[in-house]
Amino acid sequence: MARIGSFLILLSLTYALTLCICDNASNFGGNKRNLFPDFYRSSCPRAEEIVRSVVAKAFERETRMAASLMRLHFHDCFVQGCDGSLLLDTSGSIVTEKNSNPNSRSARGFEVVDEIKAALENECPNTVSCADALTLAARDSSVLTGGPSWTVPLGRRDSATASRAKPNKDLPEPDNLFDTIFLRFSNEGLNLTDLVALSGSHTIGFSRCTSFRQRLYNQSGSGSPDTTLEKSYAAILRQRCPRSGGDQNLSELDINSAGRFDNSYFKNLIENMGLLNSDQVLFSSNEQSRELVKKYAEDQEEFFEQFAESMIKMGKISPLTGSSGEIRKKCRKINNS
């Protein structure tokens, strides 16, 4: 309990020192103007405190959970907006997004979201959306791992729909080329700077062998390994990821500091030690993104500032606000189902 208490004290101090980072960039769809940090000031004043507490306890149990929660937020926002659709299980007319290719056997942390929602419902029934809870959990996950904090605009509502097909076409894949990744970010109203900064979240977490095997043995269907991959790093990866079998074997996205949110990810790209093809192409395939990688590798503070701004911007993708959507009582199912 003492360690959990120290996490919460650290988080509280961090938020007290955090400047409000505002983002006026345009996102496609939704009414993001109805999102503002004090949305729950009267209706649920302890909402952020409750989310912080549950996330801190989950992080205490398993530090990997921070990366998992951040990934859930990203995968939610890129598919019909930040509306909690990813959290829905299959039920009635709902076909879950959890079984789509980008999420199947890799998206995790749903139990923690359930814990957060239960605590919020106990404090303020029918008030705080699952979409907002997940957005706050992503911010808290950054702070717990040593990353930046930011003021989260709130007021999202939850969707009553989900799409198993949309994640397959809207989310970037680990083996995508640069142009495909950039297009998918652009489709969500995010620019090149957002792409590079948000990719920096891969400074924490892990990826499955099945997501990077092609770089070791069959890059772009050539039957040969990716010759740009740093040789000693490639040898380490081959020990963890055989040519066949071991699909679920894990490797750190940032081999130098997998549990600490820092700018090591960008330094790795410069050394040709990006785990995923979708990581390494940020340095190898586009001059503008290469310069951003270099800048963030040299200046962690600048990376942190841009990451916070880009997370705010991503969190404003096509939100449901006002009377649209609903406030789910349980994040896994729509109300009255």
Swiss-Prot record:
Q: Which residues form the signal peptide?
A: 1-22
| Keyword NADP on entry | no
Which cofactors are required for activity?
A: heme b; Ca(2+)
Q: What does the entry list as the binding residues for Ca(2+) 2?
A: T203, D254, S257, D262
GO cellular-component terms in the record? extracellular region
InterPro entries assigned: Haem_peroxidase, Haem_peroxidase_sf, Peroxidase_pln, Peroxidases_AS, Peroxidases_heam-ligand_BS, Secretory_peroxidase
Q: How is the cofactor bound?
A: Binds 1 heme b (iron(II)-protoporphyrin IX) group per subunit.
* Annotated keywords: Calcium, Disulfide bond, Glycoprotein, Heme, Hydrogen peroxide, Iron, Metal-binding, Oxidoreductase, Peroxidase, Secreted, Signal
Q: Identify the residues that bind Ca(2+) 1.
A: D76, V79, G81, D83, S85
Where the protein is mainly located, per its record?
secreted
Looking at the keywords, is Amino-acid biosynthesis present? no
**Disulphide linkage map:** C44-C124, C77-C82, C130-C331, C209-C241
* Pfam short name (any one): peroxidase
Site (Transition state stabilizer) found at R71
Q: Among the record's GO biological process terms, what is one?
A: hydrogen peroxide catabolic process
* EC number assigned by the record: 1.11.1.7
Q: Name where it's found.
A: Secreted
Glycosites: N24, N191, N218, N249
**What is a GO molecular function of this protein?**
lactoperoxidase activity
Family from the record: Belongs to the peroxidase family. Classical plant (class III) peroxidase subfamily.
Q: What else is known?
A: There are 73 peroxidase genes in A.thaliana.
Q: What does this protein do?
A: Removal of H(2)O(2), oxidation of toxic reductants, biosynthesis and degradation of lignin, suberization, auxin catabolism, response to environmental stresses such as wounding, pathogen attack and oxidative stress. These functions might be dependent on each isozyme/isoform in each plant tissue.
Its protein name is Peroxidase 14
